[in-house]
């Protein structure tokens, strides 16, 4: 299927078609904690199990993710101006036989030359030289308060068998964004170092800028299944309000469940034999208002009935929604299955807002269906 035919795509559709060739894409922007890092690692472990990766691959990916996440948590205490967003971000993507692990955080400009020197040194060495260099650093005992003298960089290069890809983008005279990416090949290839495609890192840099502009915290593009829903809920927990606002967290969790199940149960796509349905979920927040957006493929012949169902929900007031809810349940019981309409009603009742939706036509058979809902702390 050609996903490039729509000449005026929405943001989520444009992002979906760019990421569609990945079998896994997880993007998080915000504050990092040990608990959140553990959840990200757990998510990766679950997905690697689903891909039936070898034990060797899982160990390599896990180690590099752990080092990248530790680097973020160690350095996210850099002091910034109020106007400067100091959020860090983390990305893991699987493309054909490779995992791409990318991290980003703010760094003080005065530390760039030292870090560049370490990265350049590591990239200049072959496998045996890296081993000797690791021993040399250990013998010298050059450890800093931040947790090392480049040992993690050396080990990531050794375990991945690839060069370290990196970039710095100046924010102001004191701070810069540091971007770091490493590739792990699957299945394992012959030892040797291959240059990573810098265009992939450049794309991530541009994506991070868009994510910041649109106040997004989480993007999850994967095959949606009941199992993946558990991972999604686990990862969104750190992005929703504070721990005391249980009502808000529960409300958003329930809406995420409905939106995700809408993809899993009602998305259309060419027969592939896989269990899940491809789709994308985004979560953003600005001034206490959360925006949840999902997108997936549907058949064009379903657009009219789906639009009618959504319009009926949007036009109903909240008293009418109760009646519509009961009526829809009875209709679903007659048909012997739950339709998407019941989920739409539930989403509006919980969010107290109408649902925004849009269709991006792809070809004669399929369109990309996106749906968005806003939830406020004040509601």
Predicted features along the sequence, with ranges:
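Conserved short strand/loop->alpha-helix "switch" segment adjacent to the catalytic nucleotide/phosphoryl-transfer site
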Residues: 42-67, 139-146, 234-257, 276, ...
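Short alpha-helical basic/polar micro-motif
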Residues: 66-67, 154, 257, 261, ...
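C-terminal effector/catalytic modules and regulatory tails appended to multi-domain proteins
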Residues: 1-58, 191-242, 249
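Short amphipathic alpha-helical interface segments enriched in basic and hydrophobic/aromatic residues
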Residues: 49, 70-74, 261-265
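Helix N-cap and loop-to-helix transition residues
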Residues: 33, 54, 108-111, 126, ...
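Conserved beta-strand-loop-beta-strand hairpin that lines the nucleotide-binding pocket
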Residues: 6, 13, 17-26, 39-41, ...
């Amino acid at each position: 299927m050609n996903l490039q035919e729509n000449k005026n795509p929405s943001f989520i559709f444009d992002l979906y078609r760019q990421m569609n060739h990945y079998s896994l894409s997880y993007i998080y922007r915000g504050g990092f904690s040990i608990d959140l890092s553990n959840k990200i690692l757990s998510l990766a472990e679950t997905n690697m199990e689903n891909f039936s990766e070898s034990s060797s691959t899982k160990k390599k990916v896990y180690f590099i993710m752990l080092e990248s996440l530790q680097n973020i948590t160690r350095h996210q205490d850099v002091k910034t101006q109020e106007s400067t967003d100091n959020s860090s971000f983390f990305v893991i993507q699987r493309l054909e036989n490779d995992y791409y692990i990318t991290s980003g955080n703010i760094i003080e400009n005065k530390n760039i030359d030292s870090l560049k020197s370490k990265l350049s040194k590591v990239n200049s060495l072959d496998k045996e030289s890296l081993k000797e260099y690791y021993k040399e650093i250990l013998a010298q005992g050059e450890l800093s308060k931040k947790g090392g003298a480049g040992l993690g960089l050396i080990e990531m290069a050794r375990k991945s068998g690839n060069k370290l890809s990196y970039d710095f983008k100046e924010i102001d005279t004191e701070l810069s964004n540091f971007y770091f990416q490493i590739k792990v090949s699957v299945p394992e290839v012959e030892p040797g170092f291959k240059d990573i495609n810098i265009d992939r890192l450049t794309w991530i840099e541009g994506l991070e800028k868009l994510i910041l502009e649109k106040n997004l915290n989480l993007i999850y593009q994967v095959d949606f299944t009941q199992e993946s829903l558990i991972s999604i809920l686990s990862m969104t927990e750190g992005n929703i309000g504070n721990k005391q606002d249980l009502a808000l967290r529960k409300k958003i969790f329930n809406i995420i469940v409905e939106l995700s199940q809408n993809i899993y149960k009602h998305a259309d796509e060419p027969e592939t034999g896989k269990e899940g349905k491809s789709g994308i979920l985004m979560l953003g927040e600005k001034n206490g208002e959360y925006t949840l957006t999902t997108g997936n493929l549907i058949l064009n012949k379903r657009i009219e009935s789906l639009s009618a169902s959504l319009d009926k929900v949007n036009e109903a007031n909240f008293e009418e929604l109760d009646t519509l809810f009961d009526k829809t349940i009875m209709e679903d019981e007659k048909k012997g299955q739950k339709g998407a309409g019941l989920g739409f009603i539930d989403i509006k009742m919980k969010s107290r807002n109408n649902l925004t939706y849009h269709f991006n036509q792809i070809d004669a058979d399929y369109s990309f269906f996106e749906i968005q809902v806003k939830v406020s702390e004040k509601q």
